[in-house]
Amino acid sequence: MPSKQPGWFANVNPNVFFGTVIIIALFLAVVVIAPSSFELLTQQLKQWITDSFSWFYVLSVAFFLILLIYIACSSIGRIKLGPDHSQPEYNNGSWFAMLFTAGMGIGLMFFGVAEPVMHYVNPPSGDAQTIEAAQQALRVTFFHWGLHAWAIYAVVGLALAYFAYRHNLPLKTRSALYPLIGKKIYGPWGDSIDIFATIGTVFGVATSLGFGVTQINSGLHYLFGVEQSTHIQVLLIIFVSILASLSVFLGLDKGVKRLSELNLVLALILLVFVFIAGPSIYLLQTTIQNTGQYISNLFTMTFNLYAYQPNGWIGGWTILYWAWWISWSPFVGMFIARVSRGRTIREFIVGVLLIPTGFTIIWMGFLGNAALFSIIHEHQNTLIQAVQQDSSVALFEFLGHLPWSGVMNILATVLVVLFFVTSADSGALVTDYLTAKTENSPTWQRLFWTVLMAVLAIILLLVGGLAALQSSIIMSALPFTVVMLFMSWGLIKALHLDVTKMQAIQEARITPRAIHNPRSWQQRLGLIMHYPHSEEEVREYIEKQVDRAFENIKHEFRRRHLEVSITQLEDGMQLRVDHHNEINFIYKVVSRETVPPSFLIGRTEAEDGQYFQAEVFLREGGQNYDVMDWTQEDLIQDIIDQYERHLYFLNIVRS
């Protein structure tokens, strides 16, 4: 393929972009030409994978959850997803809203009522339609949508965010394998990994669009008598895609973020309504009891393969869920990484695991228990019949038994549409990240993927290929599980090095810079109290003093046969010492705006003025000290101090 693309294609990675499009086109050709044969083949392969590799899925997902708990509880959790000085890009409310809506918001609308009722009617073990079956139904539902699902997303998201923001690698799936294959991520290996992730994202969103419009169509039929047909569903896909395109056009902050926040608010309104209109005390009691049973049985359920009572249930439920979450993890993990810069690893893991799981438990607990209450205590068996005939109408049938059912069903329909829009626009943004050369790609690229997903969903809906596509996605989860295990291995290696460096810096015996400083104490105090108020003053210092110090020490390093480079940055200057196959040493002096301490200068001046400082940055980020007005000798001594710490760290790594 050509290495340079003129015009519109100037910002695409041609190998990933065109490779993805060609494979999708070939897949469509096969499905359109022989849909029945292809569906039969994929169903047989899916069944073989389920029968032969259930144990592998169960062990892998258990490992991901245990790994995250270990990382969060260890000293590794203090490491930031970005330089040490970085701060979260989004507040907690916006962050959670985007996690929730991109991860599984639409699934909660579809299965919030349907899955507990399904397990109540057909439990994995024991007698159906009993109190024990009701308790087991909620416990299993929590299990499928709780910690394990978010652990899968969190492993991919953590690996991508760590290598992208901590080590300045591209925010692409390939970067998570850097510790294992090194610079090969920039070649065919890396392109292949990104193509795989891109195809999974496109197929996953297209499948959700195709199946999801059936629920929207069901809601419109239930509310307004709109015909349930393929033509109506095609129009709905076009409508959802237009809304998604508008959100994509507005971008992450103005489009996806605001839409996610609106989704969360509307979902909370629906949840509160169900709680108030339903049996409130019963919902509180049962949800709390279900949560306790979920937690107390978590370890047993994690490793339960039903090996002594094989009935096919685990393959149709737990293994299907694990495979589905894994197949979606490149998309959701990438999106989580994109919105999580600046958070500590502990904050990331706790947030991604516990907050969505907690909301899921409340959602499933309230809606599921309210539905079971109407079946068990109010004998509303029509809900069972509705779920068995068409699970997509379960939510609307359930709301029909509550007050204000018309208004709430309209709200539910709007929520379903908005959740699909957020899934589609998030998928388009992620796909664009994977196929573009830089993050700042032209709008047409993001819109292209939105349109492609819609076209793919429409074609598969018309030829009846959605089931085959769903089976193909689930099949793709098996090789990607292996990729995730390698990701985890590489992540552990890199995190271990990061912690080792933190310990090396603390343990290194370095002579304090003040001992080298020949100034009097009066001169040193004057420097401490000096607060420049113009960025030009700091930049002038960097261009003169820092540049000369860097040139002098570069000369000495090169005399000792080390490769050294000096780079002029937009806001400062960087010195880099190459160590080839080992971690390079980086020392930067950067002009940064900060708040002047009001106890040293007049409060009015502190509040009104701007204070810039010349801050030292290492590979790990800002070091929180100012070198403004240091002499060249002071700077060189500090560089040597930091370089000595770096060598101490490398010695520990070697040993």
Specify the residue positions occupied by each region the protein language model found:
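N-terminal alpha-helical transmembrane segments of multi-pass membrane transport
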Residues: M1-A133
